[in-house]
Each structure stands twice: as structure tokens, then as C-alpha cells.
């Protein structure tokens, strides 16, 4: 562990107002110190490194020029907000980032008045900013609203919907396009290509060359002034105008996002111009700027674990089992080797979802559509129409963004699209914005859709094979973040019978019915209950929909207590089981049914096991639910023979 960086100027900054009297040279020094502080802090906590390093100068310049928090700065996604937090009175807590009870890794309204809008998902900043701009204008407040959005986020349609609206409304809104040429995976699609062309367009280069020839003939003082003016005017003359101008934005840029002497004058000019209508400032930055390991491998330093500042080497605990993501990726490649119709679709997350393995093995059969979940789902529906077998791999929380497409374009038409839902359940340090806790509730209500939930990595392998062979309609498989439980994965996984669960452990009196990875907690609860003379039956539902009615009826008939356990929100598996048991009259005989699910509230960042404990779905909570149902004290034992056999 290295000593903390020396930051004499940063030590004097208590908030953004302290930056407003600084010179450009002092702002440059402050940026260097903020960068050093951020690197040191993230080396301790882990988190999103590359994005924040790329916007240090921009962050300092924004808080120097604008009157925050009265003026609003909205950070799209929020990955890049660490320098912002350091400058806005949270430096003393910056080494608690993403820790339980510590600072959020994203902007959070409850955390600071300098966070006017919460973030976590991409492409929301312009819409929120436009709403704030119009709301402020209606209230008679003359404040500035700045939305900072990355080039990767500009691949989502929502950003253009907002820009189209802003241009038509002629509202005063400042959008800063942070063009670092790098989202988590290289940005894809027409937008990124357009930005690259903008920087090197023939029309611009020819004009610039002519201007340089003229400027070279001027006296030295005029030449220097003209060169500076030329730097600030880049991009404003591009022949036929720009896409942004067509949307009604006044375009400024591109400018160097690491030159304080470029940023400050441009931001100040835009602020003081008082122009009606939206403005877009195109700022070019480098992801990972100022830290060589992150500059050289920006994809590896987007999100990091704890690391050595000097070497850049990240701490990696030796895995006890392969991750669920890795298992999915490996099994999908194996299935694709046997069936040329299998293709993969991801929304800018090939590495995060394991589809990078498919892209390596079969590059023509893997499609990264950018941050565009709605498009990804309907694109997959089109692939299915042509006889292909698309696997759409998305994080659970991001699938929410394409829900209408799931309903209207896939499920309603019974198209055989396969949804691989990663990060299902609690996700730990990424907190509420990334928690995958709602998918069972919003998918379980859809006709025609099969939903599988993996209890361990071996089950996941079987579910990939099951999905690959399911051609009669859409099917989803959900699995959590992190490592598996260490069970052996079959070399040749066999498909599961649709809608059939399994008994994992036979017992009597009490039945624990788990879906997904809560199975391990149920088995742990059995060990605790054994000390009290109880031997519960443990079952794995496997399928949310259709669930195994025969299995549920059997458990209800043979036990006095049935505990349903899920790592999902209210309205999920437990609700389906309770409704079915009620309608079948299987609760009329006195069966004690309890449903353990995530309570009706959001859970902020913490270790997943802590989140589960707080939610009341861990082994201890299951044990308590059993004892409460039997009306036993937690220290009591029971005569097992008295329970229903």
C-alpha cells in the first residue's frame, strides 16, 4: 500500500465555490491533484476508474465556470462521477465508494445537492436535463443545466429522442458530448462512425489547411490569436452542417477535453452568451487519462478491483468456481459448434455477458448493437423470423429497458428468442440501479414465455442446452453475478424437461421450495434446523414459468409448512405459487405457506450476502421463518415424529 498523494491545492477545496477564483494554471494543478486522489481512492475500494480519469479536467472546469449546485450538472450513467464527488464536499468519504454505508458509485440525489439526478443506466441525462431546463424556465429561474453524456451512450435512441425534443422546444440546455472513443466495448454503429468522420472530414481539413496558409502570413501576434480562434471554432464549419445542428443544437467543437485553457473559455462563452436554444459542446477526451495502465488497456480498467497504484496490478481472489457468466459463454460456444443457427446479440456488453467468447469463435454470428436494448430485442425477433436461434444476453436491470419489445415483438408473436439474463438478483457494489430483482415479476406474467432460474453452474449449463433446443416459443434463463457454488459441470449437459422441478433433499414436516440461487441458503438452513430436530424437504423449482404444479401439490400434501424462497421482488415466484395453491383449494386444509422475497423497497450498495440478510432471504431468515411457522422459539427443539410424514 502506498502513502496518499500530496495534494496541497485540493486540501484547500471544500466545495466548487473554492475553485472559482483560481487561475487556469491553478485549475490545471487542481486537476492533477484530483486525478492522483481518485487513483489512490479507487485502488483501495475498486470501482469505475477509466471513465472518471478521462473527465477530470472537464469536471474541474465545469465546477469552476458554473454556479453549482444552483446550476445543474447531470452525469450520464454516472461511472465518471468520482472527480465530481471529490470536488463537491465528499472527498473525506471517497475511500468508502461502493462500500456498505459508504458513497454510491453513481450520482445519487439523496447523497448531495450537487447530484441533481440519479444515474446508473445510460442515455438518460439529456431527457432529465431538458425537463429541468423547462421546469426552471417555467419557475422563472435563470439557471444553466448541463448534461454530460459519453459517445457510447449516444448509441441509444433515448438520447436522440431528447435532442429532437430539445431542438424543437428551443430550450436553453447545454449538452457536453464526452467523446472518448471508448465505451465498455468499442462503440459501434453509425453514431461512432459519424463522430470519427467529423474529426477528419475532408471539408473541414481543406478549410483548415487554407486557413493555416492565410494565418501563416499574418504578424506573429495576430497569428497566435488566429490559431487560438481556429482551435475553438473547429467543427463549426463542416460543409453541410452537422447532425446536431439538424436537430436544432448550436454545435461547438471538437475541443481538447484535457486542455484547461481550451475548456474554460469555451464553457464560459457558452454560459455568458445567453443564447436561446440548446448547445452541444463536443469534447474529446482519453479514457484512463493520466494513469498509464488505464491508458494502455482502457477496457480492462473500466471497472476494477483493488489494485497496486505503482504496477496497476489488480487484486484477484483465486476463484473457487467459474463465474456464471463464464459458464454461460462456454456452453453457448459449445452449443453453437453443434448448431450453425445459434447467434448472439448483446447491447455493448460482450465481455460482461460472456458473448465475447462467441464473438471470438464465430465473429459473424455475434452482434453487438450498442447501448440499445430495445433494438437488441426486436433485432433478435427479426433473426428468429428467419430461422436463426438468437441468444440475447443482457443484464437483468438492462432488460427493463427493452420490456415493451419483449412483450410486443417477441412474446406476443411466440418467436423463439432466447434471453440470457445475467446479474439476476442482488449485484453488490453497483447497488439499486443495477440490481436484477424485478425480472421474475415482470416476466412471470407474460403468456407464451418459459422462464428458467439456475440454482448452480451445472443447472445453468443444462439450461443453455434447453434453451438452444426450444423452438416453440421464447425462453429465458436467469443467473446471478459472481462465481458458481463449485458443483461439477457435466461434460455433455442434457436438456431439462420444460416445467419440471426436482427434489434435492427428502425430509418431512417442512418443505423449502427454492427458485434460483437461494437453494444454497435453503440447504444451509437445513443444517441449522437439524440441530433442532427438523429435517426439511428441499426442492428446486427450476422453472418460474411454467412452474411444476405436480411438485408443488406434492409438497403441499406431504408437509405442514411450505416456505417459498426467491431472490426477487414481490409479485414473483411466491405470488404465483400462492395464487395457484389458493385456487386449487390446497390451503384449505391448514397448510402453513410462507413466501420469502425481497421486500418492497430498493437496496443500496453492499456485499451481496449482506443485502440478502437485510432482505430476509438468507439461511438465518429461512430458519426463522420455519420456526415462526411452527410457533417455536429459536432455541427450541421439536419432536420430528410429531410432524406430518
Swiss-Prot record:
SMART domains: Transket_pyr (SM00861). GO terms for biological process: 1-deoxy-D-xylulose 5-phosphate biosynthetic process; glyceraldehyde-3-phosphate metabolic process; terpenoid biosynthetic process; thiamine biosynthetic process. It catalyses: D-glyceraldehyde 3-phosphate + pyruvate + H(+) = 1-deoxy-D-xylulose 5-phosphate + CO2. GO terms for molecular function: 1-deoxy-D-xylulose-5-phosphate synthase activity; magnesium ion binding; thiamine pyrophosphate binding. Thiamine diphosphate binds at residues 79, 120-122, 152-153, 180, 291, 373. Pfam families: DXP_synthase_N, Transket_pyr, Transketolase_C. Mg(2+) binds at residues 151, 180. Pathway: Metabolic intermediate biosynthesis; 1-deoxy-D-xylulose 5-phosphate biosynthesis; 1-deoxy-D-xylulose 5-phosphate from D-glyceraldehyde 3-phosphate and pyruvate: step 1/1. Binds 1 Mg(2+) ion per subunit. Its EC number is 2.2.1.7. Keywords: Isoprene biosynthesis, Magnesium, Metal-binding, Thiamine biosynthesis, Thiamine pyrophosphate, Transferase. CDD domains: TPP_DXS (cd02007), TPP_PYR_DXS_TK_like (cd07033). It comes from the Bacteria. Its cofactor is Mg(2+); thiamine diphosphate. PANTHER family: 1-D-DEOXYXYLULOSE 5-PHOSPHATE SYNTHASE-RELATED (PTHR43322), 1-DEOXY-D-XYLULOSE-5-PHOSPHATE SYNTHASE, CHLOROPLASTIC (PTHR43322:SF5). Homodimer. HAMAP family: DXP_synth. Catalyzes the acyloin condensation reaction between C atoms 2 and 3 of pyruvate and glyceraldehyde 3-phosphate to yield 1-deoxy-D-xylulose-5-phosphate (DXP). Belongs to the transketolase family. DXPS subfamily. NCBIfam families: dxs, PRK05444.2-2. This is 1-deoxy-D-xylulose-5-phosphate synthase 1. It comes from Rhodospirillum rubrum (strain ATCC 11170 / ATH 1.1.1 / DSM 467 / LMG 4362 / NCIMB 8255 / S1).
Amino acid at each position: 500500500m502506498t502513502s496518499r498523494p500530496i495534494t496541497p491545492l485540493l486540501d484547500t477545496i471544500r466545495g466548487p465555490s473554492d475553485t472559482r477564483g483560481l487561475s487556469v494554471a491553478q485549475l490545471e494543478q487542481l486537476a492533477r491533484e484530483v486525478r492522483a486522489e481518485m487513483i489512490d481512492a479507487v485502488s483501495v475500494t475498486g470501482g469505475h476508474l477509466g471513465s472518471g480519469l478521462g473527465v477530470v479536467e472537464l469536471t474541474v472546469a465545469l465546477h469552476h465556470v458554473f454556479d453549482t449546485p444552483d446550476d445543474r450538472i447531470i452525469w450520464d450513467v454516472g461511472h465518471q462521477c468520482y472527480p465530481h464527488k471529490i470536488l463537491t464536499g465528499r472527498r473525506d468519504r471517497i475511500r468508502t465508494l461502493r462500500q456498505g454505508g459508504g458513497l454510491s458509485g453513481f450520482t445519487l440525489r439523496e447523497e448531495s445537492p450537487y447530484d441533481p439526478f440519479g444515474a446508473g443506466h445510460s442515455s438518460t441525462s439529456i431527457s432529465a436535463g431538458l425537463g429541468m431546463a423547462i421546469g426552471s424556465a417555467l419557475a422563472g429561474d435563470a439557471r444553466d443545466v448541463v448534461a454530460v453524456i459519453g459517445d457510447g451512450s449516444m448509441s441509444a435512441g433515448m438520447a436522440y429522442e431528447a435532442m429532437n425534443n430539445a431542438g424543437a422546444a428551443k430550450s436553453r440546455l447545454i449538452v457536453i458530448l464526452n467523446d472518448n472513443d471508448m465505451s465498455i466495448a468499442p462503440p459501434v454503429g453509425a453514431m461512432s462512425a459519424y463522430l470519427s468522420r467529423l474529426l477528419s472530414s475532408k471539408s473541414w481539413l481543406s478549410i483548415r489547411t487554407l486557413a493555416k496558409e492565410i494565418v501563416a502570413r499574418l504578424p506573429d501576434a495576430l497569428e497566435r490569436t488566429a490559431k487560438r480562434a481556429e482551435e475553438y471554432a473547429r467543427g463549426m464549419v463542416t460543409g453541410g452542417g452537422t447532425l446536431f445542428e439538424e436537430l436544432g443544437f448550436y454545435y461547438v467543437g471538437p475541443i481538447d477535453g484535457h486542455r484547461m485553457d481550451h475548456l474554460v473559455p469555451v464553457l464560459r462563452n457558452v454560459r455568458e452568451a445567453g443564447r436561446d436554444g440548446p448547445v452541444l459542446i463536443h469534447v474529446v477526451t482519453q479514457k484512463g487519462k493520466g494513469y498509464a495502465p488505464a491508458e494502455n488497456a482502457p477496457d480492462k480498467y473500466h471497472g476494477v478491483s483493488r489494485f497496486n497504484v505503482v504496477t496497476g496490478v489488480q487484486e484477484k481472489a483465486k476463484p473457487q468456481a467459474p463465474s456464471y457468466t463464464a459458464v454461460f459463454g462456454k456452453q453457448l460456444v459449445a452449443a453453437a459448434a453443434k448448431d450453425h443457427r445459434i447467434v448472439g446479440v448483446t447491447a455493448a456488453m460482450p465481455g460482461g455477458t460472456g458473448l465475447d467468447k462467441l464473438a471470438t469463435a464465430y465473429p459473424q454470428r455475434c452482434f453487438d448493437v450498442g447501448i440499445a436494448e430495445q433494438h437488441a430485442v426486436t433485432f433478435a425477433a427479426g433473426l428468429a423470423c428467419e430461422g436463426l436461434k438468437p441468444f440475447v444476453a443482457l443484464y437483468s436491470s438492462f432488460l427493463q429497458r427493452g420490456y415493451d419489445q419483449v412483450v410486443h415483438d417477441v412474446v406476443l408473436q411466440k418467436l423463439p428468442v432466447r434471453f440470457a439474463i445475467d446479474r439476476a438478483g442482488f449485484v453488490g457494489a453497483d447497488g439499486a440501479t443495477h440490481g436484477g430483482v424485478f425480472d421474475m415479476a415482470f416476466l412471470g406474467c407474460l403468456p407464451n414465455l418459459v422462464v428458467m432460474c439456475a440454482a448452480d453452474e451445472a443447472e445453468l449449463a443444462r439450461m443453455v442446452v434447453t434453451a438452444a433446443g426450444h423452438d416453440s416459443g421464447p425462453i429465458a434463463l436467469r443467473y446471478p453475478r459472481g462465481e458458481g457454488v463449485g458443483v461439477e459441470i457435466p461434460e455433455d449437459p442434457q436438456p431439462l424437461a420444460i416445467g419440471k422441478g426436482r427434489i434435492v433433499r427428502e425430509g418431512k414436516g417442512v418443505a423449502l421450495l427454492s427458485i434460483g440461487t437461494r437453494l444454497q441458503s435453503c440447504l444451509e438452513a437445513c443444517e441449522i434446523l437439524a440441530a433442532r430436530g427438523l429435517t426439511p424437504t428441499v426442492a428446486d423449482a427450476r422453472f418460474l414459468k411454467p412452474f411444476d404444479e405436480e411438485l408443488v401439490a406434492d409438497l403441499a400434501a406431504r408437509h405442514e409448512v411450505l416456505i417459498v424462497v426467491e431472490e426477487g421482488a414481490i409479485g414473483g415466484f411466491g405470488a404465483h405459487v400462492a395464487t395457484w395453491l389458493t385456487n386449487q383449494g390446497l390451503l384449505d386444509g391448514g397448510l402453513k405457506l410462507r413466501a420469502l422475497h425481497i421486500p418492497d423497497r430498493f437496496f443500496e450498495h453492499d456485499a451481496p450476502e449482506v443485502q440478502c440478510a437485510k432482505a430476509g432471504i438468507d439461511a438465518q431468515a429461512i430458519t426463522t421463518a420455519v420456526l415462526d411457522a411452527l410457533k417455536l422459539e429459536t432455541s427450541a427443539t421439536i419432536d420430528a415424529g410429531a410432524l406430518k410424514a
